[in-house]
């Protein structure tokens, strides 16, 4: 009688481990959630893991108790990412300093961003396990130029000389992202680390962070009456937060991914977005006229062809983006359910402007004269 073959048990499949910087922020936290759902072990870096108020939304994620660890790290501290990156196969670098009111932008924003990027690459090299680094870049690396174009792709670069000469709002952020991305491309090549940069436009959608995300201050300015942000969306490009995070993972996992990728699914001028919001959410007063903005503006498009040609598919519409953002803001009491009075009857009236400060504090019904709260030391 032939003896029955006995098979040794299969060795356990190693669970991949990745590091996410800026994990407590708008993009970082959603990316962590999606990675955990896929079974990744995630090393999430934050500035202060002991600040329960700022990390609670991460600790409450499904699988967080088994697959998530928090690590203290700071872009301004050399080598502070070493421990978090040790043992990781991949790194998603989402964190970035954003202080638009800095008195010394060169030393407080630009240099820390570039040094932080290079420090992370050095940490990857020390770990000797990291095969791929995915960097969340910015549309500010593409289209900040004196002569605006109607079409941009991954070969486009903003004009640094123009940025330094004009010093427009947020100029130090644009400059820091450009310099960091270019420096990273060179350094990663020297260290034999695959480097991918993902360039998102305005990111809109639901969120799990406790406070109001900076990009939604811009996207929802049509509702809040924050006129200073209208110029940003007069010829806007958009992507849903979930599509963006799925693209991060898609490119990390795709063996042939390399270089820069734009991740933008929609483009529209401000009048078309305002019309959509008015029709879908009539309870909000949304302007029909925008002073100084031509109704016949052409759209400016960002091409995601390189990304979609690799097989990535966008899932969400522009309406989906706004619905996710508005629903979440309402649930978190960061946005009122209406900006019209009972006597308004749907006719145009002066908007109730709501400042970023009121959003963050939850004072959603406090009327404020057109007030712009600059972004300061936030995590994207």
From Swiss-Prot:
Pfam families: Epimerase (PF01370). GO terms for molecular function: dihydrokaempferol 4-reductase activity; flavanone 4-reductase activity. NADP(+) binds at residues 54, 173. The keyword NADP applies. InterPro entries: Epimerase_deHydtase, NAD(P)-bd_dom_sf, NAD(P)_dehydrat-like. Keywords: Flavonoid biosynthesis, NADP, Oxidoreductase. Its EC number is 1.1.1.219, 1.1.1.234. Pathway: Pigment biosynthesis; anthocyanin biosynthesis. Gene3D superfamilies: NAD(P)-binding Rossmann-like Domain. It catalyses: a (2R,3S,4S)-leucoanthocyanidin + NADP(+) = a (2R,3R)-dihydroflavonol + NADPH + H(+); (2S)-flavan-4-ol + NADP(+) = (2S)-flavanone + NADPH + H(+). GO terms for biological process: anthocyanin-containing compound biosynthetic process. CDD domains: FR_SDR_e. Belongs to the NAD(P)-dependent epimerase/dehydratase family. Dihydroflavonol-4-reductase subfamily. Bifunctional enzyme involved in flavonoid metabolism. This is Dihydroflavonol 4-reductase. The gene is DFRA.
């Amino acid at each position: 009688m032939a003896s029955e073959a006995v098979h040794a048990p299969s060795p356990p499949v190693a669970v991949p481990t990745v590091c996410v910087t800026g994990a407590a922020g708008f993009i970082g936290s959603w990316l962590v959630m999606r990675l955990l759902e896929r079974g990744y072990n995630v090393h999430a870096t934050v500035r202060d893991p002991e600040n329960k108020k700022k990390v609670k939304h991460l600790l409450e994620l499904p699988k967080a108790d088994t697959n998530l660890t928090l690590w203290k790290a700071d872009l301004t501290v050399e080598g502070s990412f070493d421990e978090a990156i040790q043992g990781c196969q991949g790194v998603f670098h989402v964190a970035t300093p954003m202080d638009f009111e800095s008195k010394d932008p060169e030393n407080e924003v630009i240099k820390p961003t570039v040094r932080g990027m290079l420090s992370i690459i050095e940490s990857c090299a020390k770990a000797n396990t990291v095969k791929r680094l995915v960097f969340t870049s910015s549309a500010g690396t593409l289209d900040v130029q004196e002569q605006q174009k109607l079409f941009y792709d991954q070969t486009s670069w903003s004009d640094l000389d123009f940025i330094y000469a004009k010093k427009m709002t947020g100029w130090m952020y644009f400059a820091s992202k450009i310099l960091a991305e270019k420096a990273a491309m060179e350094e990663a090549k020297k260290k034999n680390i695959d480097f991918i940069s993902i360039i998102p436009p305005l990111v809109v959608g639901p969120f799990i962070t406790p406070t109001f995300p900076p990009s939604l201050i811009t996207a929802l300015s049509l509702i809040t009456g924050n006129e200073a942000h209208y110029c940003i969306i007069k010829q806007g490009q958009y992507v849903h937060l979930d599509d963006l995070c799925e693209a991060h993972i898609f490119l990390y996992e795709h063996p042939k991914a390399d270089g820069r990728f734009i991740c933008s699914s929609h483009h529209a001028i401000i009048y078309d977005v305002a019309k959509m919001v008015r029709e879908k959410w009539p309870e909000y007063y949304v302007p029909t006229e925008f002073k100084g903005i031509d109704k016949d503006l052409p759209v400016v498009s960002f091409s995601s062809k390189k990304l979609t040609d690799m097989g990535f598919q966008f899932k969400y519409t522009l309406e989906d983006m706004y619905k996710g953002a508005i629903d979440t803001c309402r649930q978190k009491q960061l946005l009122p359910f209406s900006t019209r009075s009972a006597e308004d009857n749907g006719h145009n009236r002066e908007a109730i402007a709501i400042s970023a400060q009121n959003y963050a504090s939850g004072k959603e019904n406090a009327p404020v004269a057109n007030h712009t709260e600059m972004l300061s030391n936030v995590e994207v």
